[in-house]
């Protein structure tokens, strides 16, 4: 099973890349974690933001295969405890489809992406910086795996 984070934005600070890679490499090969970056359209003073969101959404969905699972990261999604995420991760492993975690740009996800979601996940009711969200997703997936495998990381 593959886990993919499809996120709008590229050229992250070094600390973000290092944090992401640290958790991605900790996961076993049967739970490979991959990052797919969608370039952020440049927003100017008179930018057509709605068009940019739509274009970014189309680019995100173009990276998703026909039968792959989509989990959107949304403020109004369902909050999962670590244990609940571990249960979901176990279900996804049994399902064996690729799981795509979708993180939008500064204005959020395109409605078309949200409409395709199999599940909606909220990391927090707080507004979080998108670079930090990448690391949090990687860490939480790793932590969920440690719960399932009995690893002492989650104690």
Curated annotation (Swiss-Prot):
Keywords associated with the record: Cytoplasm, Methyltransferase, rRNA processing, S-adenosyl-L-methionine, Transferase
Compartments it resides in: Cytoplasm
Binding site for S-adenosyl-L-methionine: 73, 104, 123-128
GO molecular function, one term: rRNA (pseudouridine-N3-)-methyltransferase activity
Reaction catalysed by this enzyme: pseudouridine(1915) in 23S rRNA + S-adenosyl-L-methionine = N(3)-methylpseudouridine(1915) in 23S rRNA + S-adenosyl-L-homocysteine + H(+)
Enzyme Commission number(s) from the entry: 2.1.1.177
SUPFAM superfamilies the UniProt entry points to: alpha/beta knot
InterPro entries: Alpha/beta_knot_MTases, RlmH-like, tRNA_m1G_MTases_N
GO CC field: cytoplasm
NCBIfam families named in the record: PRK00103.1-4, tRNA_RlmH_YbeA
Quaternary structure (record): Homodimer.
HAMAP family xref list: 23SrRNA_methyltr_H (MF_00658)
Role of this protein: Specifically methylates the pseudouridine at position 1915 (m3Psi1915) in 23S rRNA.
Family of this protein: Belongs to the RNA methyltransferase RlmH family.
Name of the protein in its database record: Ribosomal RNA large subunit methyltransferase H
Organism: Pseudomonas fluorescens (strain ATCC BAA-477 / NRRL B-23932 / Pf-5)
Gene giving rise to this polypeptide: rlmH
